[in-house]
Amino acid sequence: MIKKITLITVSTLFFFGCSSKNNVTHSENLTALNWHYKIHKDIEDSNLDQADEDFLSLQAEHPSSIYIKTDLLTLYLAHQQNKEYDLALFYLSEYEKRYSSVEEIPWIEYQKIKMNFLKYDTPFTNQKMLLDIITMCDNYLKKYPNSSYAPEVSTILAKAELTNKYLNAKISRLYKKLDKPKASKLYETKIPSNSKPPVIPWYKKLFYW
């Protein structure tokens, strides 16, 4: 089972582009503690590619090491701070599957919502992703209404719903320009008068309707 998990981890990290990483060296035959120290040194040096590589080696050489648990969370936080949200989510999901306690689940699910919301950095696109975030928030608030993270999830939900309203309004206007009144009507929405539209960098506006 451990070998299978390691292989899955290797293949998943490869998917994220390990083959094209620069400034990565391969070491071997270190103690688990030395790998642990090396991973933390990599992160201190802002070399997350090397940290990923060294974590794979730690797992391969010491699959039962006590350091894997803490290093998964450390790498999650490091990639989150570096705005590499897909990799952050990968490490968090690995931690959840292998080590999380029941008490940690509300925090982990909140972190997943936050990461997905931070990934959504191009307003007026990818409505499915936006709707998925809204669904995740709704499910969280139903499942963990008394969680200490519920207020933050409610804030994300409000922002996502408002962004979706602006997106629907934009789609409605587009259909109206295309002389498709029925389709336009489907997307009509009322936007709060005191709200502000999502901010889009000028260079991204070139690709919007």
Segment roles from a protein language model:
Residues 1-18:
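Sec-dependent bacterial lipoprotein signal peptides
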